[in-house]
């Protein structure tokens, strides 16, 4: 049984970790921390978890207690894992970070986008980017895993087959992405209020979003060189979900794109390439650790449109974190993650 600690258990990704791990056959949450809610039973804060964590209460983060775990998840704002990860790694504890603290390999670039100096640049060499569909073998031997963001997960998985095959114009990629309001987190945010977000639809951060350098970093690796990406995120009035509409130019019209995508993801348990002509919906992945993809070539032209949907809290965060844990400890990659999407 893998002994699990969670730092930051009161946000959406933290409670989603609890929900998924409650049904995991080979993992047990033994520590969960929250400075603001220390002493409160988990089941009191989250009644949906009654009967699963009745003996577990939030506690103040303590390195000695966390260091006794096999793995610690950080479901915290950026900067928190910088302060604690080094001590936990020194204690022999594996670290899986759901924040952005170790996603970017360049600490200067990280500081530019997150508005503060990188707090643990010495750990970046140890950090493995936790996109299993790309880095599965590195994840197996990792000490520190950086779980990808939600937009980067949907966007990279959609573009990867085209870039790896070298058939796209890498200088003119477009990612037109939509997210539900849970992507903004559980804290007070005027733009996420029901009366502000409901019956409305808007773009934001067009000048530059924090996920842009992460997406660019991953696509460069896939392409083996520089890429040009325009990334425009939007907020839509739903709770969960990411829908990425991706555009790339592919001059060779003889390429069987459906076959290309099906072959690339044939052995991936959490990527579903839908039949030709499909239009995946966010509701089909709600609550599931699945990225559902469809590829189109409208009017048989040279513009390719890829549709990629995920649940931002599952495959875009906590589910992918558990998937990484399964790989890291040699477990069945599907363990605790077999849930179908919730419909309606």
Curated annotation (Swiss-Prot):
GO terms for biological process: L-arginine biosynthetic process. Its main location: cytoplasm. It catalyses: N-acetyl-L-glutamate 5-semialdehyde + phosphate + NADP(+) = N-acetyl-L-glutamyl 5-phosphate + NADPH + H(+). Belongs to the NAGSA dehydrogenase family. Type 1 subfamily. GO terms for cellular component: cytoplasm. HAMAP family: ArgC_type1. The active site is at 150. Its EC number is 1.2.1.38. Catalyzes the NADPH-dependent reduction of N-acetyl-5-glutamyl phosphate to yield N-acetyl-L-glutamate 5-semialdehyde. Keywords: Amino-acid biosynthesis, Arginine biosynthesis, Cytoplasm, NADP, Oxidoreductase. GO terms for molecular function: N-acetyl-gamma-glutamyl-phosphate reductase activity; NAD binding; NADP+ binding. InterPro entries: AGPR_AS (IPR023013), AGPR_type-1 (IPR000706), NAD(P)-bd_dom_sf (IPR036291), NAGSA_dehydrogenase (IPR050085), Semialdehyde_DH_NAD-bd (IPR000534). The keyword Amino-acid biosynthesis applies. This is N-acetyl-gamma-glutamyl-phosphate reductase. It comes from Pseudomonas syringae pv. syringae (strain B728a). Pathway: Amino-acid biosynthesis; L-arginine biosynthesis; N(2)-acetyl-L-ornithine from L-glutamate: step 3/4. The lineage of its organism: Bacteria, Pseudomonadati, Pseudomonadota, Gammaproteobacteria, Pseudomonadales. The gene is argC. It is found in: Cytoplasm.
